[in-house]
Amino acid sequence: MRQVAIYGKGGIGKSTTTQNLTAGLGEMGKKIMIVGCDPKADSTRLVLGGLAQKTVLDTLREEGEDIELDTVLKVGYAGIKGVESGGPEPGVGCAGRGIITSIGLLERLGAYEADLDYVFYDVLGDVVCGGFAMPIREGKAQEIYIVCSAEMMGLYAANNIAKGISKYANTGGVRLGGLICNSRKVDGEADLVSRVAKEIGTQMIHFVPATMRCRRRKSIKRQLSTFRPMTQADEYRTLARKIDGNDMFVVPRPMSIDRLEAILMEHGILD
């Protein structure tokens, strides 16, 4: 079973990317579980046909700890299983603790004992800190993919996340599998993201063109099954195949901020 975490800057498209690429893997016959690690609880909505899912933390607050697995785990497109960690009540507690609580509960309820090929963690966080680092810190995720674009904050976040991976690589065994460029129509962005990937010792595993990016439709089925060939769906199917066949897993070499800014200036991102 491969355990994969998807990180990246807030709003970069982690949840859309995760759900579409897992749908592609599901169409390949892979058995998958998505664990949403974001208080917004939108990591499984598309694969569940647009339906909101009750979160683990909400369920625990309302029903206590004596719950069954199917109370918090739902099955959607291509047999993909989905769980949402959720978050604390607004203004109270730490959202990162919700990830720790949720993964612990899933382990106790036997979710990881199923015949799974992949577990994907869709993780909130521009920086890898606290509970949001749990999939990395505790060795739950062995491979990380960072969704980014050729913009300063997207690449700054990617470099920060690489620092977190590097920090926990020896204790947790986690490795970076590559950068996924979610295009924002920036001039020369494939070259820039590839340059940054090379600089930190990894690869740009796939480039999703801006004209191919999926808008948030109500369901994955409509996204992956109703388009002509070589459209959005095929981009994510290609990404799924690349991740399934990927064998490049590295301990990244994060850059200093000065080095990152120098590269951005070379590419005209900073004046």
UniProtKB/Swiss-Prot annotation:
Recorded GO MF terms: 4 iron, 4 sulfur cluster binding; ATP binding; metal ion binding; nitrogenase activity
Record's cofactor remark: Binds 1 [4Fe-4S] cluster per dimer.
PTM entry text: The reversible ADP-ribosylation of Arg-97 inactivates the nitrogenase reductase and regulates nitrogenase activity.
Record key words, sorted: 4Fe-4S, ADP-ribosylation, ATP-binding, Iron, Iron-sulfur, Metal-binding, Nitrogen fixation, Nucleotide-binding, Oxidoreductase
Annotated GO biological process: nitrogen fixation
UniProt record similarity statement: Belongs to the NifH/BchL/ChlL family.
Main function: The key enzymatic reactions in nitrogen fixation are catalyzed by the nitrogenase complex, which has 2 components: the iron protein and the molybdenum-iron protein.
HAMAP family xrefs: NifH
Subunit structure as annotated in this protein's UniProt entry: Homodimer.
Protein name, per record: Nitrogenase iron protein
Gene source species: Ruminiclostridium cellobioparum
